[in-house]
């Protein structure tokens, strides 16, 4: 009798474990998959709008603005559930970013388009299709504001849009720019 009871208990445990594993692995219908931005991307200057007006408002010099609007850049993205690392390279240019995808605010001292990012908060949009990084910045003229960088995939994941929105405190309007990056195979 004891042997039969142990077999029955073992069978019950197995059923419970396998049922739990299948339930845990099943995708949750109310949480769509987040796009995977990992890969190597090349900036398409012709398809992009110029970042020059945005950089000018930030206070970037003429040489910086000219370089940014005419240089082909390559970016390598590595994404995990918690972190996105971006290594952007070009002739005489390197920018490494680490974005924490859990919505926390991260202190920073990063130079972005001529401004200094003081802190950054990165989170997925409500529909989990866009990654939004909000940088609290200080311009070269000492003005405060936000540089919002939104990244999302288009063209069946073969291209990425990087949209910039500059909101400076006490400025009546925002400045926008959009870059198109194509996946390298």
Predicted regions and their residues:
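Hydrophobic helical h-region of N-terminal Sec-dependent signal peptides
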Residues: 10-18
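Hydrophobic small-molecule pocket/channel-lining residues, especially in calycin-type beta-barrels
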Residues: 23-185
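Short non-domain terminal segments
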Residues: 3-4, 16, 75
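Bacterial N-terminal signal peptides that target proteins for export
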Residues: 1-10
């Amino acid at each position: 009798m004891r042997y039969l009871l142990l077999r029955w208990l073992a069978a019950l445990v197995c059923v419970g474990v396998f049922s739990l594993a299948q339930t845990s692995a099943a995708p949750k219908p109310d949480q769509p998959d987040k796009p995977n931005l990992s890969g190597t991307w090349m900036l398409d200057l012709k398809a992009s709008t110029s970042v020059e007006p945005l950089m000018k408002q930030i206070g970037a010099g003429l040489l910086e603005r000219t370089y940014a609007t005419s240089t082909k850049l390559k970016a390598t993205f590595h994404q995990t559930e918690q972190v996105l690392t971006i290594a952007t390279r070009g002739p005489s240019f390197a920018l490494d970013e680490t974005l924490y995808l859990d919505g926390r605010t991260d202190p920073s001292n990063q130079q972005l388009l001529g401004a200094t990012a003081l802190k950054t908060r990165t989170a997925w949009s409500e529909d989990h299709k866009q990654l939004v990084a909000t940088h609290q910045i200080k311009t070269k003229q000492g003005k405060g504001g936000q540089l919002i960088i939104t990244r999302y995939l288009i063209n069946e994941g073969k291209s990425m849009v990087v949209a910039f929105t500059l909101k400076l405190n006490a400025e009546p309007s925002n400045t926008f720019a959009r870059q198109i990056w194509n996946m390298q195979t």
